Amino acid sequence: MLGKLLTKLFGSRNDRTLKNLGKIVTQINALEADFQKLSDDELKAKTLEFRERLEKGETLDDIMAEAFATVREASVRVFEMRPFDVQLLGGMVLNSNRIAEMRTGEGKTLTATLPAYLNGLSGKGVHVITVNDYLAGRDAENNRPLFEFLGLTVGINVAGIGQAEKKMAYAADITYGTNNEFGFDYLRDNMAFSPQERVQRPLHYALIDEVDSILIDEARTPLIISGAAEDSSEHYRKVNVLIPSLIRQEKEDTEDEVGEGDYSIDEKGKQVHLTERGQEKVELLLIESGMLAEGDSLYSAANISLLHHVNAALRAHTLFEKDVDYIVQDNEVIIVDEHTGRTMPGRRWSEGLHQAVEAKEGVHIQNENQTLASITFQNYFRQYEKLAGMTGTADTEAFEFQHIYGLDTVVVPTNKPMVRNDMADLVYLTASEKYAAIIKDVEGCRERGQPVLVGTVSIEQSELLASLLKNAKIPHSVLNAKFHEKEAEIVAQAGRTGAVTIATNMAGRGTDIVLGGNWKVEIENLTNPTDEQIAKIRADWQIHHDAVIAAGGLHILGTERHESRRIDNQLRGRSGRQGDAGSSRFYLSMEDSLMRIFASERVSGMMKKLGMEEGEAIEHPWVSRAIENAQRKVEARNFDIRKQLLEYDDVANDQRQVVYSQRNELMDATSIQDTIKNIEADVINDLVDQYIPRQSLEELWDVPGLEQRFHQEFGIQLPIQQWLEKEEDLHEETLRERIVASWSDAYQAKEAMVGADVLRQFEKAVMLQTLDGLWKEHLAAMDHLRQGIHLRGYAQKNPKQEYKRESFELFQQMLDSLKHDVISVLSKVQVQAQSDVDDMEQRRREEEAKIQRDYQHAAAEALTDESQASSDNTPKTMIREGDKVGRNDPCPCGSGKKYKQCHGKLS
């Protein structure tokens, strides 16, 4: 109550922000008349003037009003479009490390040109990030004439372009691209072997379009570059056959009664677990199939991988549904994005789930993967010096943007008042009643000539509705993952008179639905259109446009509430753009997944009290509130998952920063001779400590053991016993100095033989390859630690603290191994000439060329409690595959030994 009173008196924080920015808008408007008088050359010269002023010490804020006035006038001359005042407000919000919520149709693409130009003046690079290659290419090409008119360069960074093209794209003042591509380039740069192979500059300013989709929806899907692991496809096939014979437990276990069934499903948590009865049954089936020894347990340490296959197969059969979570196309399982309804070719679920689904569908089973490098979007984007984003729906997630990324959300007002009529939800008892009501509503719209966009949550639901509309003889278009090739065309014409379009979730996002149809698309489809043809198309469009407005504008019809209010708001936001007429309504039933899982008891109780009959719907603010509360619960749960993922990844991120900064220093250094000397002393002293403990009696020394170990590890014969016999005054400290000096002498002899320059190059190559090999193994060890850490909770220990402690120990071991392995390789390998270093580099490049990028997608699971945060819910995504090194192949580190006798030992 008090809060509302204070807001009324002083205005909300959002109001105060807009009021302050409004003063700068007034300044920009005051400059407009002067800028209109400038010639094209004078306007273009402003860019050079601004850059000179920045060099002299002025800040971006000092020149912002003039820079925005420059872009506004250039937009009028290049595009014949004048940015509105609200777009100037949006541009200022984006320049100030904030998120701008701008409604659909308010011109976010043009708004982005304002802060992109301003920050592009610094010459440090601006990254404009979109959700897919199509939007990146479209926005770059659309805005290129404006930026080039003002003297700024534009680059496009999409998948499939070469290294030289990428370098050019990143060298541009403004670079358009997708979040995946920017993240992969960062990982790839940190796997490079020379500064020339890196493509990115330091991360300066990121401007993210559809920021909620990238920073929230995809926050659970880390970017991973990986290599192929061992083939275990036969295991997946054998286990897959066993799962259909298991029975679901319908009733939960109580103190008095154990529910019958082999597995239980937690729908809220999207998890499945074997019951005790199920465990016994699976063990029996595995014994019968010869996969488990008689008397052995599925949960014994030796059978961990078998348990992994069983769990993956169980999840594939019970939690993942064809045409909802994935489709099968061309003998491949292709994931469907739960947020957009689009297919994601090339992406794969992690932890064996994708292979289990492939086994279930009887298609070719691809190999599992081993992580080579990874980063979450959260940690990638937090590295930018400046970060901003825009979307039509951010306010519901404002807390998360602030808590995770430190970004405030500012709701930018619309240019024209919103007149869309958002009607209350209608709730039916059964799905069949709901669909009957939807068909009736669609028929009514068609009779009025009002276009309808029907939003569904899955491909399966969109196809069911399509068949119902077909039976009702209602012409319609279907927009889902199976027909995405026609996406832009279908969306462009979804606003025609009486058009009926079924769209899965937010398919078509980024393309406006124009009332009356899109006349520009019609003109583009003509070859060399005449002025008369263009005039006729525009005149016809105006007639259709007026008819659609008269019929009530675009009607949005939601067939189910999404678990996030934001996704529902995105669907509604397709209607009512730029002050157009429009309406929206959601049709729900008690059989919908959100209602069944989260809101069923309370709403069912209300419906029964009201004595509802078949075909009758309930429409009441209480029901809408109960549904919204259910959505809030799910949003809070999903926020906790993302927060926990980040807390665990922060541990790995600290280590990643250390390793990557070390790599960059190594690559940029002309010589690492001093580093080699330092670690050489550490390694030799550590080795001597094992055989000659410090301040110990000579009787406790194991001199023969030390001589033998030195020969094994470093290929050097040291006559330590002879030294001790001949020189009575040789004590522990002087002996250590003698051993270090002997190694240095042997190494200097090698340097004299091959030349200092060749050896310096070889040292760098060995250090980099060894670091990369150990980092890869460390990531695998971290994965294993993460998957089992939740069990520490049973020992009354905090899993997060244990993870931090043990991961630090693993990291320390990795650094110790790095020192030892580098000195060992440098001691043993005989470098004859520069050609040996070149051969080593060539082998590395061949290995690199084998790595084909592939994506992997995390199964969208919720974590039901703290202990599960580190269990089998770890999303591992977007993977690049490479061939596995055979045990008898030469080790990639260049030591000349077989892999099994070198780095293979470590794994």
Curated annotation (Swiss-Prot):
Residue stretches of biased makeup (Polar residues): 865-876
One Gene Ontology molecular-function label: ATP binding
Record has Ubl conjugation as a keyword: no
Organism superkingdom: Bacteria
Chain sites annotated for binding ATP: Q87, G105, E106, G107, K108, T109, D512
Localization, UniProt: Cell inner membrane; Cytoplasm
CDD domains: DEXDc_SecA (cd17928), SF2_C_secA (cd18803)
GO BP term, example: protein import
Keywords: ATP-binding, Cell inner membrane, Cell membrane, Cytoplasm, Membrane, Metal-binding, Nucleotide-binding, Protein transport, Translocase, Translocation, Transport, Zinc
InterPro entries in UniProt: Helicase_ATP-bd, Helicase_C-like, P-loop_NTPase, SEC_C_motif, SecA, SecA_CS, SecA_DEAD, SecA_motor_DEAD
Gene3D superfamilies noted in UniProt: Helical scaffold and wing domains of SecA, P-loop containing nucleotide triphosphate hydrolases, SecA, preprotein cross-linking domain
Region feature (Disordered): 834-907
SMART domains: SecA_DEAD (SM00957), SecA_PP_bind (SM00958)
Composition skew (Basic residues), residue ranges: 897-907
Membrane topology recorded in Swiss-Prot or TrEMBL: Peripheral membrane protein
Cofactor(s) listed: Zn(2+)
Reactions the enzyme catalyzes: ATP + H2O + cellular proteinSide 1 = ADP + phosphate + cellular proteinSide 2
Residue numbers binding Zn(2+): C891, C893, C902, H903
Function (record text): Part of the Sec protein translocase complex. Interacts with the SecYEG preprotein conducting channel. Has a central role in coupling the hydrolysis of ATP to the transfer of proteins into and across the cell membrane, serving both as a receptor for the preprotein-SecB complex and as an ATP-driven molecular motor driving the stepwise translocation of polypeptide chains across the membrane.
Recorded family membership: Belongs to the SecA family.
Name of this chain's protein: Protein translocase subunit SecA
Upper lineage: Bacteria, Pseudomonadati, Pseudomonadota, Gammaproteobacteria, Alteromonadales
Gene responsible for this protein: secA
